């Protein structure tokens, strides 16, 4: 896929609520998340009503799968399926730049919520251990909310991961 697409690796209203409107207006394809989150994308309108926002349900033009790559110019994101916050959550890892687009999987000092529909705490911890804690300490984590962090800091100080 390319930068001429609208990429959504997250599926809740706070991340994907305007996706359909933007894609239509800008004439872009929508890529992602993983198909396991289709139920959330088909409930965006209802999610929006709960928060007084307008949102349109949509089906992506292409779903993201574990092992896919997304290219932006000369930057390549390696897609990893990381269920837990949501069953179809994916992250993007740029190995060359040592950067991660983590969405709502890992935060500075915390982890994503698992109390939302089909969230699963153990799946989230397993995803983090398998796909993030295996990376070098200097990998920068761009979180879906809040300040950036890095793998080394989270490995040493994140209360959810210290004994994981």
Where are these regions (language model features)?
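N-terminal low-complexity segments that are often proline-rich with Ser/Thr-Pro
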Residues: 1-2
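Active-site HxH/HxHxD metal-binding segment of metal-dependent hydrolases
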Residues: 5, 9-71, 156-160
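Metallo-beta-lactamase
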Residues: 46-47, 75-164
């Amino acid at each position: 896929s390319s930068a001429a697409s609208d990429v959504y690796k997250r599926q809740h209203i706070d991340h994907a609520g305007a996706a359909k409107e933007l894609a239509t207006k800008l004439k872009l394809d929508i890529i992602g998340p993983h198909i396991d989150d289709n139920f959330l994308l088909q409930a965006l309108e209802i999610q929006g009503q709960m928060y007084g926002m307008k949102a349109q349900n949509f089906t992506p033009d292409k779903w993201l799968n574990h092992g896919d790559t997304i290219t932006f110019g000369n930057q390549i994101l390696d897609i990893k399926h990381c269920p837990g916050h949501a069953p179809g959550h994916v992250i993007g890892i740029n190995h060359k730049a040592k950067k991660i687009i983590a969405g709502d999987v890992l935060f500075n000092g915390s982890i994503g919520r698992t109390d939302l529909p089909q969230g699963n705490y153990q799946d989230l911890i397993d995803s983090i251990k398998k796909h993030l804690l295996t990376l070098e300490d200097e990998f920068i984590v761009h979180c879906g909310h809040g300040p950036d962090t890095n793998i080394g800091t989270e490995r040493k100080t994140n209360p959810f991961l210290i004994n994981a």
